[in-house]
A protein has these predicted regions:
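Short hydrophobic alpha-helical segments enriched in small aliphatic residues
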Residues: 14, 39, 43-45
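N-terminal beta-strand motif that seeds the catalytic metal site of vicinal oxygen chelate
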Residues: 43, 47-73, 127-130, 187-223, ...
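An N-terminus-focused feature that recognizes amino-terminal "leader" regions
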Residues: 49-180, 185-191, 216
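Short, structured motif recognition centered on aromatic/hydrophobic residues
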Residues: 62-66, 80, 85, 99, ...
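Active-site region of the double-stranded beta-helix
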Residues: 82-86, 91-96, 228-270
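Extended catalytic-interface subdomain
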Residues: 127-129, 146, 151-242, 250, ...
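Long compositionally biased, domain-poor regions of proteins
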Residues: 259-261, 281-343, 347-356, 362-369
Length: 397
C-alpha cells in the first residue's frame, strides 16, 4: 500500500456555537489513486480521502470557486487579467464571468438586482461568496440547516443548476458544490469563451487558504461555526503585537485538509483588522493565498503586469539566516523581490509575499510551500509591523 501522508489527530477539541459536547477526531489516511478497490469501487483520477463519515460529515474536498462583486465590475476584470486569470466562460443567462488559472476559479458577478450586486452596494468591491466542494450537496445542505445554518437565496433560472448555499461570514454565501472536476457546474450553466492559451501565465495553481477578519469578541463564534457545521479543527493560534496595535489569529482547517481559514480578531480599536472592518463596513474575507510552484517567476510575471506588492523593511533580510536556519535561498533574490521566508531545514521552507490592497481592503498572498505547512508565523510580526508603519504614515494610528 502506498501511503502518501498520515495526518495526526489534532490536539484540541473544538468549541461549538452554541456550546456542544466536544467531538472526537480520528486520524485519517490520504491514499494514492488505485491503491484501494473495496467492493469494486471506482477511484477517480483525484486522490481519495478515506475516513469515517463522522470525521468529514460534509464530505469537504477543497475550494471550488471564489465569487467577487463590485460597483465597477470592469475594475475586477482588469485586475484578474493583470493577475493572469483569463475569462474562460460566461454564464448562459446572467452577467457572471468565470476566470481561471490552474485549479483556481474566480467568478465576477455583475448581474443587476442580484444578491451579489446588493452585496457590492453594502461593501463596495468585495467577496460575496465562495464554493466548497462536497461529496453530496443535498445531504450537506440538509445537515447544515439541521445544525442551525441559515439558507442562502435561491436564484436558479429555468434549466439551470440549483446550487444550495448557506450564509457565512459577513452575510456572504458558502455554496455546496458536488459537481467538479471532469463534470462540473460550468458545463451546465456556462458557455466557453474564445480565450487563447496563455504562455505568459504567472503559474498560480491552487487556493492555499483565505482569511476572515471578525469583530472583537467574535472569533469563537466563527471558529465554532466551521467546527459545528464542517468539523474544522484549530491547527494554529497566534498573538501578534506591534508597537501600537495587535491581533489574534486562529487558523482552522477542514477534515480533508484542503480548506484552510485563519480567523483574525483585533486586540484594539486601531489595528489593521479594525481598519478593514471600517472600510469594508463589516466582517469578511481579508485576503486569499494562491500557491505557486515557482514564486520567483510568479512574482516577476505579476510585477511585469503591473501588480503592486507590499514592501518589507530592509532590516527583515538582515535576520533571515539566523531565524530560518539552513534555508539555502539567495538573500539577494529574496530581497530584490521583497519575498518573505519562514521555516527551517527540519520543518520545511515557506516563501510568501502580499499584494497591496486591490479590491477595497482585500489583498492577495502568493505562497510557495517546500514542506512547510504553516502560515508564515515567523513573518507575521514583520508583516504586521510593516503594515502598522504604513498606518502610522497615513495617520490611522
Amino acid at each position: 500500500m502506498a501511503i502518501i501522508a498520515i495526518i495526526p489527530e489534532w490536539c484540541k477539541s473544538g468549541r461549538a456555537v452554541p456550546p456542544q459536547p466536544p467531538q472526537t477526531t480520528r486520524e485519517f489516511l490520504v491514499v494514492e489513486r488505485g491503491v484501494l478497490d473495496y467492493a469494486g469501487a471506482h477511484l477517480s483520477a483525484h486522490l481519495k480521502i478515506i475516513m469515517n463519515p463522522q470525521d468529514n460529515p460534509m464530505g469537504t474536498d477543497g475550494f471550488e470557486f471564489v465569487e467577487y462583486t463590485a460597483p465597477d465590475p470592469e475594475a475586477l476584470r482588469a485586475l484578474f487579467e493583470k493577475m493572469g486569470f483569463r475569462a474562460v466562460a460566461r454564464h448562459r443567462s446572467k452577467n457572471v464571468t468565470l476566470h481561471r488559472q490552474g485549479d483556481i476559479n474566480f467568478l465576477i458577478n455583475a448581474e443587476p438586482n442580484s444578491f451579489a450586486q446588493q452585496f457590492a452596494r453594502d461593501h463596495g468591491g468585495s467577496i460575496c461568496a465562495m464554493g466548497f466542494r462536497v461529496r453530496d450537496a443535498a445531504l450537506a445542505f440538509k445537515r447544515a440547516l439541521e445544525l442551525g445554518a441559515e439558507p442562502g437565496p435561491t436564484t436558479a433560472g429555468p434549466m439551470e443548476l440549483n446550487i444550495p448555499s448557506i450564509k457565512g461570514i459577513g452575510g456572504s454565501l458558502i455554496y455546496l458544490v458536488d459537481r467538479y472536476g471532469a463534470s462540473s457546474i460550468y458545463d451546465i450553466d456556462f458557455r466557453p469563451t474564445d480565450a487563447a492559451a496563455d504562455d505568459t501565465s504567472p503559474g498560480l495553481q491552487l487556493i492555499d487558504h483565505l482569511t476572515h477578519n471578525v469583530a472583537r469578541g467574535q472569533m469563537d463564534l466563527w471558529s465554532g461555526f466551521y467546527e459545528r457545521l464542517f468539523n474544522f479543527r484549530e491547527i494554529r493560534y497566534f498573538d501578534i503585537e506591534g508597537k501600537k496595535t495587535g491581533l489574534f489569529s486562529r487558523a482552522m482547517t477542514s477534515p480533508c485538509g484542503k480548506i484552510r481559514i485563519p480567523i483574525n480578531e483585533s486586540r484594539d480599536d486601531k489595528s489593521q483588522i479594525e481598519e478593514y472592518l471600517r472600510e469594508y463596513r463589516g466582517e469578511g474575507i481579508q485576503h486569499i493565498a494562491l500557491s505557486s510552484a515557482d514564486i520567483y517567476r510568479t512574482v516577476d510575471r505579476l510585477r511585469a503586469n503591473g501588480l503592486a506588492f507590499q514592501d518589507t523593511p530592509d532590516t527583515y533580510y538582515d535576520g533571515v539566516d539566523a531565524r530560518v536556519t539552513g534555508h539555502q535561498e539567495s538573500l539577494a533574490e529574496l530581497s530584490r523581490r521583497r519575498i518573505l521566508i519562514d521555516g527551517s531545514a527540519q520543518d520545511g521552507i515557506l516563501l510568501q509575499i502580499f499584494t497591496t490592497n486591490v479590491i477595497g481592503p482585500i489583498f492577495f498572498e502568493i505562497i510557495q510551500r517546500r514542506g512547510n505547512e504553516g502560515f508564515g508565523e515567523g513573518n507575521f510580526q514583520a508583516l504586521f509591523e510593516s503594515i502598522e508603519l504604513d498606518q502610522i504614515r497615513r495617520g490611522v494610528v
